[in-house]
């Protein structure tokens, strides 16, 4: 079955004019032999569809009745004319729209060319409109009036507080019969300063608010820096940064403080002495039994210990080792 399919594919490729090796084993990432579809498309005689062509024209070269036959190619200006035509649904060319003679009763209208809608912001900044400048001036006036009212209210509150503080000690000294004199009303606040007549167009209400907020923050920082701060904890990094440059001096010790060094001893002799001390009682007990020295009654009557060196079996290796060690 696979051989039949392979034969069929080879015959089909030969009819088209493509070799099977160039299709399967060609590693060329470009050209007509990149894929089977491109190879078939190059060999087949297909009629390409005509492409739509647009012509970019400037506003100065508008349609004129003198050369009505020319400029028949559709351009992007036709798209704008079609968009402005709200009454009719059919699409027409700019030449057909402009060929209509204008009515005598209609006033001449001067339309500006259709603007191209782009997703990028315009680099040229437009000048602020007079309505916008008037709105910003009104906002500035309102903000300044509110700030003046706040300042006047603060001044009145401060005066009331000072009068209450002055009257509180004097009220205790007066008798109950005497009536407390009512403080006169505070004087009216001073009128707000006149606003400048000429305001720069670029300044707005938000910019003014930001500037005054920055001034208040800077004033608060200056007050905070005026008071002396408490000394903080010392920084250990600053203390330890000069540790490498510290030099130590040598100090002589007294003979009493110096500990005597142990003398160099032979390790074999030290081990032999320890073994002799450990197994001395055993040799003594064996010598007494061999000599026939009677044990005391207290030792004979006493019960043997459950655990101890007597449980171990005696061998002659340890005895020979002790005898071979030279006496120090």
Swiss-Prot record:
The keyword Phosphoprotein applies. It comes from the Eukaryota. Residues 116-127, 166-181 have a biased composition (Polar residues). This is Mitochondrial fission regulator 1. Its main location: mitochondrion. May play a role in mitochondrial aerobic respiration. May also regulate mitochondrial organization and fission. Belongs to the MTFR1 family. The keyword Transcription does not apply. Residues 95-106, 288-298 have a biased composition (Basic and acidic residues). Residues 131-167 form a coiled coil. The modification Phosphoserine is found at residues 119, 129. Disruption phenotype: Mice are viable and fertile. However, oxidative DNA damages appear in the testis, associated with a reduced expression of genes encoding enzymes with oxidoreductase activity. It holds the Pfam family Mito_fiss_reg. Ubiquitously expressed with higher expression in testis. It is found in: Mitochondrion. Residues 95-135, 166-235, 283-312 are annotated as: Disordered. GO terms for cellular component: cytosol; mitochondrion; plasma membrane. The gene is Mtfr1. Residues 1-48 form a transit peptide. Residues 183-196 have a biased composition (Pro residues). One of its GO terms (biological process) is mitochondrion organization. Keywords: Coiled coil, Mitochondrion, Phosphoprotein, Transit peptide. Residues 178-299 are annotated as: Necessary and sufficient to promote mitochondrial fission.
